[in-house]
Swiss-Prot record:
Pathway recorded for this protein: Carbohydrate degradation; glycolysis; pyruvate from D-glyceraldehyde 3-phosphate: step 2/5
Pfam family, one: PGK
Similarity comment: Belongs to the phosphoglycerate kinase family.
Binding-site positions, ATP: K202, G293, E324, G350, G351, D352, S353
Keywords from the UniProt entry: ATP-binding, Cytoplasm, Glycolysis, Kinase, Nucleotide-binding, Transferase
UniProt: substrate binding residues: D22, F23, N24, R37, H60, L61, G62, R63, R119, R152
PROSITE patterns xref list: PGLYCERATE_KINASE
Organism of derivation: Borreliella afzelii (strain PKo)
Gene3D superfamilies listed in its UniProt record: Phosphoglycerate kinase, N-terminal domain
InterPro entries to which the protein is assigned, alphabetical: Phosphoglycerate_kinase, Phosphoglycerate_kinase_CS, Phosphoglycerate_kinase_N, Phosphoglycerate_kinase_sf
PANTHER family reported for this sequence: PHOSPHOGLYCERATE KINASE (PTHR11406), PHOSPHOGLYCERATE KINASE 1, CHLOROPLASTIC-RELATED (PTHR11406:SF23)
Quaternary state and interactors: Monomer.
GO BP annotations, alphabetical order: gluconeogenesis; glycolytic process
Protein name: Phosphoglycerate kinase
Amino acid sequence: MSIKTVKDFNSFAGKRVLVRCDFNVPLKEGSISDDTRIKAALPTIEYLKERGARIVLVSHLGRPEGKKNLKYSLKPVANRLSGLLNQDVKMFSDCIGSEIVNNTLQMKDGDVVLLENVRFYAEEEKNDKNFAKKLSENGDVFVSDAFGAAHRAHASTVGVSDYLPSVGGFLMEKEDKFLGEVLKNPEKPFVSIIGGSKVSSKIAVLESLLSKSNVVVIGGGMAYTFLYSKGYSIGKSLLESEYIDTASSFLRKAKELGVKVILPLDHIVADDFNKNSTPEYIDSLNIPENKIGMDIGVNTLKEIEKVVKTAKTIIWNGPLGVFEFDSFSKGTAKVAEMVASCSGLTVVGGGDSVAAVNKFNLSDKITHVSTGGGASLEYLEGKILPGIKVLEK
């Protein structure tokens, strides 16, 4: 089902539009180290500005645990927005209360203001009705554009929609469109590349994508549990012993469905898990008992390249090795390059794989790079996200 968007709303002129954004950006000593999420909100903000809206932005930042903590103030975001929008974005000292509401009522068409961190109130994460009502008093219309928080049923993502007409922004629409396309109607051949360290955090995604995929590539730390389940030795590599049967049953299911599963055929290993460890190549499925698997080898990459070249749809979620250590990032870098050069629909879903694509400067060559970490993962698991459900037509 598609969602209602800003384009479905008649007129924003003169209206206070409460826009839930995801400005949960990384801060280093009070300054923003990556403004990707702020830039992702700009198309919606610009669209509303052009239509004479009075824009009241709302977001969370970090985990202040329901208390006012200026370390988590959105002030740096207001400063960055002022530069990006080329206009003064006023920072309000709170997100609810009569003084704040009065200030929003004094706004002029085209004004943009930012409310203080909603998570300074414990009621936000509890989706407290009274808090949601107070928050809704800052707007006449609600626009939800925080896909990164859409898997949370909080007051600012779900609760306010009980009190205001609600539509999705362009980012929410884009995420729903591309992730939805991958799940509902992927053009074949469809290749799912799933990495990351733990089977426990990715098995639901693997199972959700299995019946739709032609090929599933499994890499990262979780691949060793799959290899172990097939009887290979994995040395000191990461093993989730309680997921050996789960891995085994997944591989059996894939075989029954005729889905090809690519596991590491060779490895880059090390003596210990350390960024300064010396990489060593093992041209075998088996890893020596005193070694740790850290990355995929050249034969595995050749196998992945064959399927990526002919793919019409690719979803990639999670790194293929310990990419945060430069010596063990080559497998992930090569896969990022392969995905970027694929002519089909390519979607990179959330978290570390997005960081990898950015690290190797390839994001502009990917059809869609998702901004949601946990939200992308839950969407790909086939779960209904509460922040999207409230926007459905």
